[in-house]
Amino acid sequence: MGNHISMCLSNSKANTNVRTNGSSTWYPQTGQHISIRTFRQLRAQQMSRPTWRKTETSLILEFPKSMADQLEEVSNLPTTHMPKHSIQAVNPRPSI
């Protein structure tokens, strides 16, 4: 049974009912370099606008290892984070 990688993409906007989803499965070649990029939207009630965080992980698959071992290695790799946008403090409304 050959190794394969599955990927699922999702994109949604808070103000619309439109969602874009996609998925892909492929079989990488031995020693192929793969870069995984993820973008996560961070939301907090105190934030006036959402903040996005980008993480990137690069890896080279080694087929003699089991997929479980490879996934464990990926989860242990360090990720790089883009600087967070400055968050302005939100003043609470004055009580009436």
Curated annotation (Swiss-Prot):
A lipid is attached at residue 2 (N-myristoyl glycine). It is a lipid-anchor. InterPro entries: Gemini_C4. It is found in: Host cell membrane. GO terms for biological process: symbiont-mediated suppression of host innate immune response. It holds the Pfam family Gemini_C4. Residues 77-96 are annotated as: Disordered. Keywords: Host cell membrane, Host membrane, Host-virus interaction, Inhibition of host innate immune response by virus, Lipoprotein, Membrane, Myristate, Suppressor of RNA silencing, Viral immunoevasion. It comes from the Viruses. One of its GO terms (cellular component) is membrane. Belongs to the geminiviridae protein AC4/C4 family. Pathogenicity determinant. May act as a suppressor of RNA-mediated gene silencing, also known as post-transcriptional gene silencing (PTGS), a mechanism of plant viral defense that limits the accumulation of viral RNAs. This is Protein C4. It comes from Tomato yellow leaf curl virus (strain Israel).
